[in-house]
Swiss-Prot record:
(7R,8Z)-bacteriochlorophyll b binds at residues 128, 148. Its main location: membrane. One of its GO terms (biological process) is photosynthetic electron transport in photosystem II. The keyword Methyltransferase does not apply. It comes from Acidiphilium cryptum. It is a multi-pass membrane protein. NCBIfam families: pufL. This is Reaction center protein L chain. It is found in: Cell inner membrane. It comes from the Bacteria. The chain crosses the membrane at residues 8-30, 58-86, 91-113, 146-173, 200-225. The lineage of its organism: Bacteria, Pseudomonadati, Pseudomonadota, Alphaproteobacteria, Acetobacterales. Keywords: Bacteriochlorophyll, Cell inner membrane, Cell membrane, Chlorophyll, Chromophore, Electron transport, Iron, Magnesium, Membrane, Metal-binding, Photosynthesis, Reaction center, Transmembrane, Transmembrane helix, Transport.
Length: 252
């Protein structure tokens, strides 16, 4: 279509997107408000388990979830097609697949392991935020989840690493009046002087990709552990720390 490659998977992606969007609008029409902040498509009640629910009582959520997975999967496969046509690696669809994995973990894998679709999150702005808050408090302090710590660390490290790279590039190609534009060797020299090491212009992008994918994978893992594999408050998980032999020294 014009300059955009569509292909078979582009068509299937468009189908799932339009169907899912129409179902969200239908669900909003069944609800009490058209306030964009308050619209919510909730999953079935826990009493339905892993069964199919009536449309107005969670069935729409189930179909919308199928549409979302279909749209995301189609888009990833479309990216594979485009990558092959361009003769490049599959880095982009592989990276997007990690984001898809995180979504599927939240809406399919974790609810399956916990025995009810009602453990998925609702589709809505405020209702989604409420779900995040309630899920966190269900485990007393979610920040004590070790994989949550890893995920947050990787998210912030991704931002820091790519911000350092981006700011250096802007500084190199926008010199003060009277100075020449700097190139990669100047950038390498700057970081060798700054922190003693330069990963290089290609390496920083690979590092950014690695950190970002690690953050997505760790975030999926942290919620997957909560419920199916750990049902207590996360602070109590750290009890092993108090029993390390090192604390026995000094008579304590």
């Amino acid at each position: 279509v014009g300059p955009f490659y569509v292909g078979f998977f582009g068509v299937t992606a468009a189908f799932f997107i339009m169907l899912g969007t129409a179902l969200i609008i239908w669900g909003a029409a069944l609800g009490p408000t058209w306030n964009i902040w308050q619209i919510s498509i909730a999953p079935p009640d826990l009493s339905y388990g892993l069964g199919l629910a009536p449309l107005a009582k969670g069935g729409l959520w189930q179909i919308i979830t199928v549409c979302a997975i279909g749209a995301f999967g189609s888009w990833a496969l479309r990216e594979v097609e485009i990558s092959r046509k361009l003769g490049i690696g599959l880095h982009v669809p592989a990276a997007f697949s990690v984001a898809i994995f995180a979504y599927v973990t939240l809406e399919v894998i974790r609810p399956l392991l916990m025995g009810a679709w009602g453990n998925g999150f609702p589709y809505g702005i405020m209702s989604h935020l409420d779900w995040v808050s309630n899920t966190g408090y269900a485990y007393l302090n979610f920040e004590y989840n070790p994989m949550h710590m890893v995920a947050v660390t990787l998210f912030f490290t991704t931002t820091l690493a790519l911000a350092l790279h981006g700011s250096l590039v802007l500084a190199a190609i926008n010199p003060p009046a009277g100075e020449t534009v700097k190139f990669a060797e100047h950038e390498d020299t700057f970081f060798r002087d700054f922190i003693g090491y330069s990963i290089g212009t290609l390496g920083i992008h690979r590092l950014g990709l690695f950190l970002a994918l690690g953050a997505g994978f760790a975030s999926a893992t942290c919620i997957l552990l909560s419920g199916p594999f750990w049902t207590q408050g996360w602070p109590s998980w750290w009890g092993w720390w108090l029993h390390l032999p090192i604390w026995q020294f000094g008579g304590h």
